[in-house]
Amino acid sequence: MGRCFGIGPFLCPPAQNIRKKITATQNILLYLQSKSKHMAMLAKFAVKNFRGFAEKIELDLTRHSNFNFNLYAIKDDVIKNGIVYGPNGSGKTNFSLAVFDIVNHLSQKWKKADYYANFTYAGDPNLKVEFEYTFRFDGQTVEYSYAKDYHGIMTAEAMTVDGKPVFKRADGKFTIDTEAFPIDKSIQHNLADNANNIPIVNFLLMSIPLAKDHYLIRLQQFVNGMLWFRNLDVREFIGLETSVYMLEEYIIKNKLIDDFRRFLLNVSGQEFEFAQPRAGEKVLFCVIDKKRIPFMAIISTGTKALELLYFWMQRMGQATFVFIDEFDAFYHFKLAFEVCKILFNKDCQVFTSSHNTYLMTNDLLRPDCNFILNENKIKPLVDCTEKELRFGHNIEKMFRGNAFKV
């Protein structure tokens, strides 16, 4: 294996080898790797009345096509990797935040402090925000839906597994599969009223002994592994971790300085000589003309973004679903391509949003993995045209020529 976080060398070439087509052999290797084990997957997501989305908007990751290239982007018949495009103000950030609402009540991981500010659709803040998730856990299909008011308080909740109802709470009523969860009538009555707004999933997880492969345990594990982050005016993240790290202190403490140096060289072509840290030092220093200069004092905004990405890539071994908002805001367009090749080979679902149409190429993904979000809809490119799309098509040129209509 290569030295780029366990990723084969053909996925982490020098930066000048941009858009080098993945050979048939490499594609087969990636496909076999993707088939090596089942993953817990987010298969569908829908939301209504969230911020700017007055109508229901749905992302269906089971609607993939039968392209015979870049097979690694599909796992267990679910889209594993994708990029979301859309005009400014179309709702890319808000949609990604909506996907991560589930972290707020099913996980003790890091939360976005202002998440529930401007939570509901501005046209009618009294409307309930409705969320629908479909997960795939080793052949099981778990559908989980709920509604929250403008304070973020849950007002309804329901779950089905393989089409069979598990529980439902709505309008002061509560039903549950008592064979699967034998709980007293008095408790069922209290859950119907639920004055203290305890999510039913959390109650069952805390009250009922479950097997380690039970779908509720799998759901909890999946949500604990969800990660959203961005690096714009401020660095923000949701999920996966319970505390904030100092990036360079983390690199030093975990003896990753040389690995970080190779990462910067491989993805961006930048070569730094890092000084050996002295006892107690928590920041990186570079050696320039035999002088120690603080790393942060000499690097660009884009390289700072790469440092943040490097940190999260170290943590992605624990991740299940990752969304990086405006991931390439400070990247050169070719650097963004190299970063995507690394991200999309991770053993978890990874999605990004971007305005960089250089990434809209069949050398990286497929037309069913590039999405356009606009006017309260999100669709893959294959559903935005009647034309049959093939590997040889220049989909970036087609996009710029307005060939795709949402």
Task: For the regions a language model picked out, list residue spans one by one.
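Conserved D-loop-proximal element of ABC-family nucleotide-binding domains
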Residues: 329-333
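Targeting/processing segments of secretory and organellar proteins
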Residues: 2-3, 7-8
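Pre-Walker A-like glycine/lysine-rich segment at the N-terminus of P-loop NTPase domains
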Residues: 39-100
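Post-Walker A helix-loop "phosphate-sensing" segment adjacent to the P-loop in P-loop NTPases
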Residues: 101-113, 317, 345-347
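Phosphate-coordinating catalytic segments in nucleotide- and nucleic-acid-processing enzymes
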Residues: 27-38, 44-48, 56-60, 107-312, ...
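Walker B catalytic acidic pair
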Residues: 325-326
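The start of beta-strands in P-loop NTPase/AAA+ ATPase cores
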Residues: 320-321
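C-terminal lobe/lid and adjacent interdomain/linker elements of RecA-like ASCE P-loop ATPase modules
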Residues: 22, 28, 32-44, 337-406
